[in-house]
């Protein structure tokens, strides 16, 4: 953490590549640093200048009289390795490489990037970048920036970690228009060394940061990110915008910074489990953060709306309810506080519609009544522009209550021109405001979700005894791809799962012998792992009623597969189950960055049709297993609805937790499907009917 402190709070800085040419990156970077009011010492290396902007220049790095804490490198990429070595020789331990032209520029740039990565590791010099705009720290005791693209932002409590410098600049510019400040801004660029995990941990412990924003293109250290984000998100909200959430977006990410985007599903699972709030646009990133930074989190979901327009009030109500909030009718006590001071035609139910004639005094009466109502958790102020309203007076009413911070206060000022004078007051006061009801509703909903998230919830994990031979099975078959079905079944049985009765057979005589233990009707399946989609490829024959039909089915199956696979004679016979059961799916997928992802949902032939599934990263806690079961749309049918019998949900939970534990034990598993799993009535169990495992 010491290096990150130097990165953001350097006592002295060395600029290599500062320029006299106005408008150049080297010139603007130095100018912005000076204008920001930086409290430390600035050293400049430029062999062709005596001074720049009143600061003395040195010909070489070794000529600098002291050892600066931080180096800021602005030279062309080709010279960066040489400059980095010279900085290390000087004793500098931390460097920001602003220069572009590395991995994002093609093969030659990638070679240069690998070279500077090697220098960093061998010499112990920490690097932010390359291809970034560096850092901003608005702390009055520091006032430091390496940003060449925009002015120093207003001081605030939001910090921003971004892989894209352009996104940083856009967010800063938008924030300036709203009067919202920042504490720290860090542009990571190509992340050759310092990454978002280290920065997240640092900001998690930073007293001047209340809300953390992140723009992510790729996470290289996925497991560490989850560990850190889980810890930090309990102290302060983390809002993340993940780029590359579509196949086209993933390709754009690859060409933009040389990163390969992970699967959207994986990232969404990671964010959800780590307590990270995912947003879908840079606008949402800012809009939500401004509320988080300025207002207390709601204690409940009850919202009181004050408005001067019926239509927008309805839109706001719909948006709030759609996002999980409640707009309940007000108590008679609250109505009576408002009634004597407003039009007899005003609606006092909720929304409180004061009509177009509302002025600042009427608004204040209504706002005060809702603010004092203990049944209201958040006050939602919504005003449509009206020429007869003194918007500046209204803005002062808003500011007065928003600054109290005893209750969540959300402001929506619709329109632009006619509300601008009021907006200017809110901007100066640092009060967040929204232009439209739906955005404000989503921001408030996320604030409530975070409020619920930080309430203490225990996490308990269940351990199981697993047969050690499972490891031997998997090691022996590692790298073979999908393993044979009989081997899948043996692994699952040794892991404690219940399966439908089954036997393996190698020839007709063996088949007749084994069927006596299973009984009719039965199911015949090809056992070879080479046949991945058994049902589609004719590798499953259902409802076989007698020995004659069984032998005929076996002969047909052998004929079908003898030219396609090696072990075409090996088959599985299972008891054909008919009756009252529901089908679910359980699965695992190993992700290179994050480890095993566990899937649960509606199973059987409906998996691909309805895609009613949910995911968690392994290990899964007992509480998370409960959440998974409740999250799918099919849950009411498992619980019992409209005369349906309740299913064995405890056994489903046992299977989820057992699978999670198995994934921690059997790391060789790359992919697993348990589908279908038949779930019977409560206390009557669940049984795996089919499975596939890839190692």
Q: Where does each model-flagged region fall?
A:
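Catalytic-core regions of core metabolic enzymes
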Residues: 1-695
